[in-house]
Swiss-Prot record:
It comes from Methylobacterium sp. (strain 4-46). Keywords: Cytoplasm, Protein biosynthesis. Transmembrane segments: none annotated. The lineage of its organism: Bacteria, Pseudomonadati, Pseudomonadota, Alphaproteobacteria, Hyphomicrobiales. GO terms for biological process: cytoplasmic translational termination. GO terms for molecular function: ribosomal large subunit binding. InterPro entries: Ribosome_recyc_fac, Ribosome_recyc_fac_dom, RRF_sf. This is Ribosome-recycling factor. It is found in: Cytoplasm. Responsible for the release of ribosomes from messenger RNA at the termination of protein biosynthesis. May increase the efficiency of translation by recycling ribosomes from one round of translation to another. It holds the Pfam family RRF. The keyword Cytoplasm applies. The gene is frr. Gene3D superfamilies: 3.30.1360.40, Ribosome-recycling factor.
Amino acid sequence: MATPTFDLADIKRRMQGAVNSLKHDLGSLRTGRASPTLLDPIQVEAYGAAMPMAQVATISVPEPRLLSVAVWDRGMVSAVEKAIRESDLGLNPMTEGQTIRLRIPEMNEQRRKEMVKVAHKYAEEARVAVRHVRRDGLDLLKKLEKDGAISQDDEKRQADQVQKVTDQHIAEVDQTLAAKEKEIMQV
């Protein structure tokens, strides 16, 4: 059996993965502004399978509060329209030929606060994921030190580096959350 080795780059990569996942999740939150990522969670019944919206149409933002969905296949327009109506985004599609226009309504104060709570939940999940990666790294260091593969000083030095990387990624999560919260609360 191969002896496990400590790889700080792998820990950084896994922590960055948690941050990237948060950014993706926050991108799909409605803010009152039009964004093509708003439609990312919507799956369209196409050709006998559920497909992401981006695989059946081009999504653009002609105005700050308007999304334009240009469906590639004329026969798919009704399926795309149905998927948008049935999503929990509360959007009302207006169809003009192969183009579906989606007006993004302004959010009221209560809805904004609900979105901020969801954003905080996503951020906390990202923090927990980063901390799990830290724990995995620290556990591996302790095991390597216990097995005699590294010295106690090396274990301490590497543990300090893991903590520093953790702090950087937690700070990035907090900055990302603050920016999204500001965007959501902007009227």
